[in-house]
Amino acid sequence: MKLPRDLSGQQLVHALNRNWEYREVHRVGSHIILQTEVPRHHRISVPDHRPLRIGTLNAILRSVAEAKGVTRQQVLASL
């Protein structure tokens, strides 16, 4: 599955909130800090840019997949 080319940081935050139990902890400049406790503590920083760069999006998806114990493709399909 190809990565979306027009996904904004805010859209990614919303999808991670809705589908993967991440919640916004705070903002630092143009970055949104998200955190989850399920299945273990994990914190990520999502830039609030429009659109997100492909490498940045790929790194965030890989990090979420590793923390949740699923594949990157499963995380990507939920966007």
Regions from the PLM with identified roles:
Residues 1-79:
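Basic nucleic-acid-binding interfaces
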